[in-house]
Amino acid sequence: ERLVTDYDVEVLSTCVQNYVKGENEIPAGDEWINGVLVRRFMAEPIHPELHRFYVRKSKWIRKFRKILYQLNILRFIADVYPIWRQMNEIEQRVMQSYMFYSPRLIAHIQKCKNEYKAIIPINISYPLAYYTSLCAPDKTILVPTMHYESSTFRAIYTEVFTSVAYIGFNTVSEQRLAENIFGRRMSPHGLISVGINVVADADWVDVKRKYNLPEEYLLYVGRIDKGKLNHIVQYFLHYKARYANSKLKFVLVGGLFSAPVSHSDLIYTGFVSENEKYAIIRHAKIMVNPSKFESLSLILLEGMQLGKPMLVNGKCEVLKEHCSKSEKAALAYWNKNDFISKLASLETSSELCREMGKKGKVYVETYYSWSVIMERLKKAIESV
């Protein structure tokens, strides 16, 4: 939306609303939203069993490339052999059996690519970013949102990362990861990232009553599934068992994609509106991001913007980078006991929370204000 004053902007998406089911629940067609033309296309049905079969069948090439990365030699091999075609057909089937695969959307880009000045696919983990990047690589500004995980080492990505016009990363850690995978033959690249919006809070009295929220709480915002939570619920319950006098509850905001743990100290809100989310963040005592896989972490930056002290998973390079660059506006924990220790320090020290909150606000304003981000993005668009 921030580009509409300078460009005609279209957003191409699918009709999928729930990524787990992968069903076309939103009508196909065009819609104007805040000056942006949103075009929605039907996605193919997902085939979970078939997808898992192809993932297993192509595992060896990902594992081989990951081992070369761990030995710190993949980048040097990539300088000589930038494009890998091993297991290409099987990895194509991995993509085509996955969620959000839409031949109709891809065909639209192929047909209309000459009408676009720039194409900006986001998230290389999903089929659309991969296929749209190859439709018009000379016009493509790829925003890969990469993580250190198995899928990052797919051989088919080598063609994309060496042929697109520009690659915009969210953090230095993400950029370094890509450089060590794709080497010096990788396309021109740099940081773009994303800015943080200021959203008005919903009325706190109404929100608190609606979701039965306590006075003091640790807050998680995101998908409620095992892959994102990484034992954090169990860690918190161990904390409460050790510190019986603690008044903290654990509020989890987001859709339920795995069975919730039932406990009197745990409160699940389900999906909330943006205004409600900001009200819940503003009144949290402490926030936590337990994910091991992040390319940026918007929720961490939103919390910092509102002066919230953060606890993050130390096993995620991107989150560790935020801790360092913000001068410890966020604290990394490494295991259950470390989490318990640092949460206790934050719960019992208002001064520490205030100091971290001040640092977080400065960090977001310095690195993630929209003026900084839009200058980078427009420069990338004009370069293609």
Name every feature range the model reports, one short phrase each.
Residues K139-S150, Y157-D203, L213, Y220, ...:
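Donor nucleotide-sugar binding/catalytic pocket of nucleotide-sugar-dependent glycosyltransferases
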Residues P309-N313, V318:
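Short hydrophobic beta-strand element within catalytic cores of glycosyltransferases
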Residues K292:
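Aromatic "clamp/platform" in nucleotide-sugar-dependent glycosyltransferases that forms part
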Residues V38, G254-Y278, H283-I286, S326-E327:
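Nucleotide-activated donor-binding/catalytic signature segment of Leloir-type glycosyltransferases, i.e.
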Residues K210-K228, V233-L237:
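Conserved donor-binding/catalytic core segment of Leloir-type glycosyltransferases
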Residues E1-M42, N114, F236-A244:
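N-terminal subdomain of nucleotide-sugar transferases
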Residues S345, L352-T366, R376-K379:
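A short, well-ordered alpha-helix in the C-terminal region of glycosyltransferases
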